[in-house]
A protein has these predicted regions:
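ATP-dependent phospho-/nucleotidyl transfer catalytic cores
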Residues: 474
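Accessory carbohydrate-recognition regions in carbohydrate-active enzymes
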Residues: 22-358, 362-405, 411-469, 477, ...
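Extracellular attachment/recognition segments
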Residues: 706
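Bacterial Sec-dependent N-terminal signal peptides
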Residues: 1-23
Length: 761
C-alpha cells in the first residue's frame, strides 16, 4: 500500500472513530458514590448516592442500612432494603420525613430484613439524575429519575403471579391509605431526629399506571390483606400486580411538608412526561448547573474528582419551600409549624459551610443564595434566631455564630433582593442571646465574651477557645456588614473592638491559642495535641490559625513572618500524635488525621482547611502551591473512599472546587480570594452577570505544582490574592507552571492579602 493510501485509510478510520466516540458532558464525570465507603469509626465522606436535583427538596437513595441508621447506604453492603426518599444532611444529624419503597415478587414481605435483596455494583448505575439497580433475589430492575419535589420510578418485573410494591412509612407514627379507584397510595410519615415542631409531617402520594390486583396495609409489622387504611406507630402498604416478563410498572411519587393536597400539587412537576423524558430533563438541569464551570484536561480521573465535588457543592442547602396551586412560594415552617409565604432552606451547618461553600455560591450561583438569604430572613422571623445548624429547624450541633459570616459575605458580594435590615437585626441579636432550648444557636458564653473579651476555660462552657476565635471573626463580619449598610460608628464600634478578641487567647509562650481562666491565667496543664476541651474537633495546632480576618495580626503576635512560617511548617512536621482524653476514645476525625501521613494537618475536618493558604500572607506562597497540590492529589479521588473525612454538605467538596480554580476565600466578607495554583490546563467560569473568568495553566504537568509567573488580564501579577471585582469583571489568568518554586514572586508586603489590623481605623 502506498503512503498516500495508508494515510487516507488512517484518516478514514479516525473519522469513523470520531463519529462513534461518546461526547462527554459535565454530569458524565460525576460519581455519586464518592464517599460512600464510610463507617462510624472512619469517614471517607459519610455520603450516600443522592439522586436529586440541585438544591432539591427531596433526594432519593438506595438503602442498605437499617431503618433509622444514619449510614443509609454503604458501598460495601451486599443487600438493598429499599429505595428511600431522604432529607439527611449527614449520618450525625440523621434523617427526617423519610419513607421507603421496595418492589418484590412472590408472597408479600414487609419486614425490611426479610425483603432485602442482593445487588451488585456491576449492575448498578448511579448518576445525579438517574439511578438503576438490579434486585437479584427478585429478578427486578428498579430505576429512579427525580425532580425537585417528585420522582418517577420504573420497575421492570419478571413473569409473576404476584408482583408487589411495598410502601414503608417508617415508625414513630405514620399513616397510609390505599385508594384503588385512583390507583394511588397516600399517607404521611412523622419520623425525625429532632428540630421539628409537634405537627411535623411529610405527606406523600404515589400514583401507579395500572389498577391494583392486590391490596393490603401493614399495621406495626402485620400485613392485613384487603384493608385500605393503617394509622399506627409503623404503617405501610403493599399493592400487587400480575406481570409478564419485562413488563414495566411506572410509579409517580411526590411529597409535601404542607399537606396531602400540596403533595398532589407537587406531583405536577412530572407533568405528562414519561420516565425517559423526566430523566432527560434532569440530565439537562445538571449539565446547566455543573457547566457553569467548564474544565479542559487530559486527565479523566481529575475531571471525575472535580465534577463529583461540584455535584456535592450544589446539593445543600436543601430547598424547603413549595409552590401552591396559585403558583405562590410557600413553606411549612420547621420553626413554628405554620404554613407561611416565602422561601425556606435547610440542612446545612454554618460552622462547616461558611468557610467556602457559601462563598462558592456567591461567585457561581448568587441568585440561589439570594433566595437562601430570603429564607434566613424568614427563619429569624419565625424563631427569633438565625440558625447555626438547621435540619430542618434548629439543631444542637457545633459552635460559633457563623450565620454572621453567611449574611455578611452575601451582602458584601452584592446580593440585595431580600430584607438586609432584618438580617442586620438578626445578627446583632445573635451576639447577645442564646436560644432557650438549643444552646449552639446564638452565642453561648456571650456574657463572658462581651465583658472579658474571651470565653473562659473554667466556667463550664466547653470548646471555649474555639468559641472565642469564631465569635471574634463573626464580630468582624458584623462590623463589615454594618458599614456597608451605613450604620453609625457608635453602633459599629463594639464589633470592631471585639474583632481583635482573638488576641486574648493567644499564648506567647507557646505561640499557640490556649484556654484562659476567668482570672486571666492560661490553663494548666496544656497539651497542643489535646483534641476537644478548649477546641472543637481539633487541637491547638489546628485552631491557632482561625484568625481569618487578621492573619497579619497573628503574624505580629508570633513575632514576625519567620516564626509564623515555622509554625505553619510545624503543622506538617509534628508527627500525627494526639491526646483523645477529652472524648475518652479516638473519634473518627482524629483517626483520619493520623492515617494521612501529613503530620498534624487534619484536612478531613474544617477548622484547618484554610491554613495552607496562609503562606500567602507571610511571603512564602510557593508553600501554599506545594501543599495545595499535595492535598488535592492525596486527599481526594472519585472512588467510594474519595474523601479524607466528612464531606459535610458541600464544604470539603467546595474546597477542592476553589483550589482547582486556583483561589480560595480565606476570609469570607473581605472581597478577596487568596491565590494557590490551578489544577487544570484550562478552566472557564461562566458567571451569572454574563462575564467569563478564564484560567489557563501552561506546562501544567503533575510535577509542576509551582507558579513560575502569572499574568492577570495580560499584565504581570505578583499579588497573592485576587479581588471579587477582578473576578466579576471577567478576569483572565495565565499561569506558567514549574517544578521548582519561584521564591522571588509574591514576597513583597504589598502582595499579601487583606488583614484587619492593616486597615486604618
Amino acid at each position: 500500500m502506498s503512503k498516500r493510501k495508508l494515510f487516507t485509510a488512517v484518516l478514514a478510520l479516525a473519522s469513523v472513530c470520531a463519529g462513534t466516540a461518546k461526547t462527554y458532558e459535565p454530569v458524565d464525570y460525576v460519581s455519586t458514590l464518592v464517599g460512600s465507603e464510610s463507617k462510624h469509626s472512619l469517614s471517607t465522606g459519610n455520603t450516600y448516592p443522592a439522586v436529586a436535583m440541585p438544591w432539591g427538596m427531596n433526594f432519593w437513595t438506595p438503602q442498605t442500612g437499617k431503618m433509622g441508621d444514619g449510614w443509609t447506604y454503604t458501598y460495601s453492603a451486599d443487600k438493598l432494603r429499599g429505595f428511600k426518599q431522604t432529607h439527611q444532611p449527614s449520618p450525625w444529624i440523621n434523617d427526617y420525613g423519610q419513607f421507603a419503597v421496595m418492589p418484590e415478587v412472590g408472597a408479600p414481605v414487609f419486614d425490611e430484613e426479610k425483603r432485602a435483596s442482593w445487588f451488585s455494583h456491576k449492575a448498578e448505575v448511579a448518576t445525579p439524575y438517574y439511578y438503576r439497580a438490579y434486585l437479584a433475589d427478585y429478578d427486578i430492575v428498579t430505576e429512579i429519575a427525580p425532580t425537585e419535589r417528585a420522582a418517577i420510578m420504573r420497575v421492570t418485573y419478571p413473569e409473576a403471579e404476584q408482583a408487589s410494591f411495598v410502601v414503608d412509612a417508617y415508625d414513630d407514627g405514620s399513616y397510609v391509605k390505599v385508594l384503588p379507584e385512583q390507583n394511588m397510595v397516600v399517607g404521611y410519615t412523622t419520623k425525625n431526629n429532632g428540630g421539628v415542631p409537634e405537627n411535623f409531617k411529610n405527606y406523600f402520594v404515589l400514583k401507579f399506571d395500572r389498577p391494583f390486583a392486590y391490596t393490603s396495609v401493614v399495621v406495626n409489622g402485620e400485613i392485613k390483606s384487603g384493608e385500605l387504611v393503617s394509622q399506627c406507630n409503623h404503617a405501610g402498604a403493599i399493592v400487587g400486580f400480575k406481570t409478564k416478563r419485562g413488563e414495566q410498572l411506572n410509579v409517580r411519587i411526590a411529597s409535601s411538608f404542607i399537606s396531602e393536597e400540596q403533595a398532589v400539587e407537587n406531583l405536577k412537576e412530572l407533568g405528562n412526561d414519561d420516565f425517559d423524558a423526566v430523566k432527560a430533563r434532569g440530565r439537562k438541569t445538571w449539565n446547566d448547573v455543573l457547566g457553569k464551570i467548564e474544565v479542559k484536561s487530559h486527565d479523566i480521573d481529575h475531571l471525575r474528582t472535580f465534577y463529583s465535588c461540584l455535584y456535592r457543592s450544589v446539593l445543600f442547602p436543601r430547598s424547603f419551600y413549595e409552590k401552591n396551586v396559585q403558583g405562590e412560594i410557600v413553606h411549612y415552617s420547621p420553626y413554628n409549624g405554620e404554613v407561611l409565604p416565602g422561601y425556606m432552606f435547610t440542612d446545612t451547618g454554618f460552622w462547616d459551610t461558611f468557610r467556602c461553600l457559601f462563598p462558592l455560591l456567591n461567585v457561581m450561583y448568587p441568585s440561589m443564595n439570594e433566595k437562601m438569604q430570603a429564607g434566613l430572613v424568614n427563619a429569624y422571623k419565625e424563631s427569633g434566631f438565625l440558625p447555626e445548624w438547621a435540619s430542618p429547624g434548629h439543631r444542637g450541633c457545633m459552635v460559633g455564630n457563623n450565620s454572621a459570616s453567611i449574611v455578611a459575605d452575601a451582602y458584601l458580594c452584592g446580593l440585595k433582593n431580600y430584607d438586609a435590615e432584618k438580617l442586620w437585626e438578626a445578627v446583632v441579636h445573635g451576639t447577645k442571646a442564646v436560644h432557650p432550648t438549643v444552646s449552639s444557636t446564638g452565642r453561648l458564653g456571650y456574657e463572658y465574651y462581651n465583658k472579658l473579651g474571651y470565653v473562659p476555660y473554667d466556667v463550664k462552657i466547653n470548646e471555649n477557645v474555639a468559641r472565642t476565635l469564631e465569635y471574634a471573626y463573626d464580630d468582624w463580619c458584623i462590623y463589615q456588614f454594618g458599614k456597608q449598610l451605613g450604620k453609625s460608628k457608635k453602633e459599629l464600634e463594639p464589633f470592631r473592638k471585639r474583632a481583635f478578641n482573638y488576641r486574648n487567647v493567644f499564648d506567647k509562650e507557646t505561640n499557640l491559642m490556649r484556654g484562659r481562666l476567668k482570672n486571666g491565667e492560661f490553663q494548666k496543664p496544656f497539651s497542643p495535641l489535646k483534641w476537644g476541651d478548649a477546641f472543637t474537633e481539633g487541637n491547638a495546632w489546628h485552631y491557632t490559625w482561625s484568625v481569618f480576618h487578621d492573619p497579619q495580626g497573628l503574624i505580629d503576635l508570633m513575632g514576625g513572618k519567620q516564626v509564623f512560617n515555622q509554625m505553619l511548617d510545624s503543622v506538617f512536621n509534628v508527627p500525627p500524635l494526639f491526646d483523645d482524653s477529652y472524648y475518652g476514645a479516638v473519634i473518627h476525625e482524629i483517626r483520619e488525621m493520623q492515617i494521612m501521613n501529613m503530620g498534624n494537618y487534619a484536612h478531613g475536618n474544617q477548622p484547618v482547611q484554610h491554613m495552607i493558604y496562609l503562606y500567602g500572607y507571610s511571603g512564602e506562597p510557593w508553600k501554599t502551591q506545594y501543599w495545595i497540590r499535595q492535598t488535592m492529589d492525596r486527599m481526594y479521588n472519585a472512588n467510594p473512599d474519595g474523601y479524607c473525612g466528612d464531606e459535610d454538605n458541600g464544604q470539603t467538596s467546595a474546597w477542592y472546587v476553589f483550589s482547582a480554580m486556583g483561589f480560595y476565600p480565606v476570609c469570607p466578607g473581605s472581597g478577596e480570594y487568596v491565590l494557590g495554583a490551578p489544577r487544570f490546563d484550562e478552566m472557564t467560569l461562566h458567571l451569572e452577570n454574563g462575564k467569563s473568568v478564564s484560567i489557563k495553566a501552561c506546562n501544567n504537568e503533575d510535577e509542576n505544582c509551582y507558579v513560575k509567573t502569572l499574568q492577570l488580564n495580560g499584565a504581570p501579577y505578583t499579588k497573592n490574592y485576587v479581588t471579587r471585582t477582578d473576578l466579576m469583571n471577567g478576569a483572565q489568568f495565565v499561569y506558567d507552571m514549574a517544578s521548582e518554586p519561584n521564591k522571588q514572586r509574591g514576597t513583597a508586603e504589598s502582595d499579601a492579602p487583606y488583614s484587619f489590623s492593616k486597615v486604618k481605623k
